[in-house]
Design a protein with these regions (language model features):
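Short aromatic-glycine-(Arg/Gly/Cys) micro-motifs in beta-strand/loop hairpins
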Residues: 54-73
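Hydrophobic pocket/interface hotspot
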Residues: 12, 69, 86
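Short beta-strand/loop turn elements enriched in aromatics
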Residues: 1-9
Length: 138
């Protein structure tokens, strides 16, 4: 089995197991609907790829007896009394941003290019996001 492609939604629905099996194995799995083609991808593979492609570039600085975290280029920042608290707050702030992006920011010109980081945030658990922020390999 190589590429799995179905030319219509109806055909894909009838072969959903084949699409899912192909995606889970890392094969190309696509569905065409009208003029759009959509890929099905295993979540763990996509998350791993995005985390290796998108560095967090988080900057953590001591400030006023605590710690502040921000990511240049993203409208997200967090503070905490300790380093770990600041990182935990940043995980929460990233989740809020991803929710806002999905809800109303995805078409805003100054946010639409954040698609990849929003996918990474949404596909990660809290520990994975923490590791991504501090640069730990998982």
């Amino acid at each position: 089995m190589s590429i799995v492609h179905f030319g219509s939604y109806t055909e894909a629905r009838a072969h959903l197991k084949d699409l899912l099996d192909a995606a889970e194995r890392g094969r190309v799995a696509t569905v065409r609907r009208d003029t759009a083609t959509t890929a099905m991808v295993d979540v763990n593979r996509l998350r791993h790829f995005l985390s290796s492609l998108i560095p967090a570039r988080a900057e953590v600085v001591p400030e006023a007896g605590g710690w502040s975290v921000f990511i240049p280029g993203l409208p997200v920042a967090a503070d905490g009394d300790t380093f770990d608290e600041a990182i935990a707050e940043m995980v929460d702030a990233l989740r809020e941003y991803a929710d806002d992006w999905q809800d109303h920011l995805l078409d805003a010109p100054n946010h639409r290019e954040n698609w990849g980081v929003v996918q990474l945030i949404s596909l990660s658990d809290d520990d994975q996001l923490r590791d991504w922020l501090v640069g730990a390999a998982r």
